Amino acid sequence: YKNIITRSRDELDLKDSALVEELFKNNKIDIVVLAAAKVGGILANNTFRADFIFENLAIQNNIIHNSYKYGVEKLLFLGSSCIYPKQCLQPIKEEYLLNGELEYTNEPYAIAKIAGLKMCESYAIQYGCNFISVMPTNLYGINDNFDLYNSHVLPAMIRKMHLAKCLQENNMDSIKLNLGENYKSILKEFGISKDSVNI
């Protein structure tokens, strides 16, 4: 691909509908990969519930609608594996979506991601847009958040293992590495980037 347009969070607030529309109006955008989102670990999701649903809905609404309005040829929306029911069978299958109760701790985030998926589906049905969704597994990569309270499962595990290694007492029992019962696959960030280009 040539002429790739990217904006950091500091350069463009995707929650601001006027700024997002200006980006689309001033650039002929053919393909959009919507990977932007407010994300965090279980503690952040459960503590800042309103922020997670509001910010993610705003980002998705602005990008998806302007992609339609300005004739984007293809939009790829990256959802989240948390949209599937809390007690869903493993491995996860597409047909499990909306067939059970969501995990309470990240329910607002999951609902926002489900709304993004349904927006893409609805714009495809009503307007014939080539808007598709993929639900990647848990990701990690460069510049990930390794905070013990706000990160996702794998970065938190890496941080805990590092801390354990640094302990002079060599007491591994003091470090809890709990994946929980609903273990979900984990994929390095590069893998999803490479795979998404081929969808």
Regions found by a protein language model. Give the residues of each.
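SDR active-site strand-loop-helix element
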Residues: 7, 32-38, 75-81, 134-136
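NAD(P)H-binding glycine-rich loop region in Rossmannoid oxidoreductase-like domains
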Residues: 17-57, 66-69
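Conserved Rossmann-fold NAD(P)-dependent oxidoreductase catalytic core, especially the SDR/UDP-sugar
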Residues: 61-106, 132
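Conserved sequence/active-site signature of Rossmann-fold short-chain dehydrogenase/reductase
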Residues: 15, 81-84, 139-141
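Adenosine-cofactor binding site in Rossmann-like domains, unifying the SAM/SAH pocket
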Residues: 2-22
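Active-site helix of classical SDR
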Residues: 108, 112
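NAD(P)-dependent short-chain dehydrogenase/reductase
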Residues: 87-96, 118-199
